């Protein structure tokens, strides 16, 4: 049974574009066209406003929490072409870094798994993807993939650090040899996979073609060590695809249509166990989908989104605006 356990009145003055829980599930970050980022304490069903962060000069599209091993850190991106990294010090949130290396709207930010290091991917309407890595002493190193997507990049999502098949193949006590990968979706109707080479440069690893309009979001599913990699993608064409790869080399990806919606699909988000997918679309609903034992994806719930509020859903710990 899926039910709404909490609804947070954010008091944003315009449309909410993203809402993300932190690692521990006690804090909620939201962002809006009103140019603000807000952080709430949502423990025990409450909603206490902790911070109202003002630093962007345009609509804020997305927020992303860093792993807590790096402290209480939040990244945000905006139409104003900026990425801002916020940090909490002694109970006060402050801007700790501002990246202005893009020529157009920055549409997506995503922190890499902590096993990869303190690393942030940023996708922009200028077609480029930036990789920001912390080098210490307040310094950030920037690598940029130019022309990653024709017209623009709308979404980025990191591959999990758990290696597919490690649950059955990894020798006991042996340190994993991680290969950094992430997925991106763009205005060229493509999902692309990127891999870091031994020399530290990033190259296109795979190009996944199935959508007939702009790819609005991609989400690489968490891995529990089973020998399958899974990615969800959604598009302006109203379709959601589930991409799976069963070979160890990661070269063969197969798409499966989850559903064809009657409107644009803006976001897809996996539960932490990767067995439930939340889909948020232009029909003002969030639907939850679960794979049955025979491999069919079934809709198990749909929730109407509120105006200016964020709802927390019990099943799969999914959170959508």
Residues covered by each model-derived region:
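Terminal intrinsically disordered, low-complexity extensions flanking WD-repeat/beta-propeller proteins
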Residues: 163-170, 177-180, 216, 226-229, ...
């Amino acid at each position: 049974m899926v039910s709404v356990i909490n609804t947070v009145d954010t008091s944003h003055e315009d449309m909410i574009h993203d809402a993300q829980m932190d690692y521990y599930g006690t804090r909620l970050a939201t962002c809006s066209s009103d140019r603000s980022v807000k952080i709430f304490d949502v423990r025990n069903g409450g909603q206490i406003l902790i911070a109202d962060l003002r630093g962007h000069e345009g609509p804020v599209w997305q927020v992303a929490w860093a792993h807590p091993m790096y402290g209480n850190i939040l990244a945000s991106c905006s139409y104003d072409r900026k990425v801002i990294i916020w940090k909490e010090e002694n109970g006060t949130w402050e801007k700790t870094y501002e990246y202005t290396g893009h020529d157009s709207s920055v549409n997506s930010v995503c922190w890499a798994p902590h096993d990869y290091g303190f690393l942030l991917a940023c996708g922009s309407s200028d077609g480029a993807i930036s990789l920001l890595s912390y080098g210490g002493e307040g310094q950030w190193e920037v690598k940029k993939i130019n022309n990653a997507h024709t017209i623009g990049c709308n979404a980025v999502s990191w591959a999990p650090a758990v290696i597919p098949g490690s649950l059955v193949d990894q020798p006991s006590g042996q340190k994993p040899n991680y290969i950094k990968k992430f997925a991106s979706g763009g205005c060229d109707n493509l999902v692309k996979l990127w891999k870091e080479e031994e020399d530290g440069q990033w190259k296109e690893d795979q190009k996944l073609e199935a959508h007939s309009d702009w790819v609005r979001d991609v989400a690489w599913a968490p891995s529990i060590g089973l020998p399958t990699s899974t990615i969800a993608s959604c598009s302006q064409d109203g379709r959601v695809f589930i991409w799976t790869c069963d070979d160890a080399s990661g070269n063969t990806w197969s798409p499966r249509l989850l559903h064809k919606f009657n409107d644009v699909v803006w976001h897809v988000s996996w539960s932490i166990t990767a067995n439930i997918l939340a889909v948020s679309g232009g029909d003002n609903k969030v639907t939850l989908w679960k794979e049955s034992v025979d491999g069919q994806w079934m809709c198990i719930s749909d929730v109407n989104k509120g105006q200016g509020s964020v709802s927390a859903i019990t099943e799969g710990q999914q959170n959508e605006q």
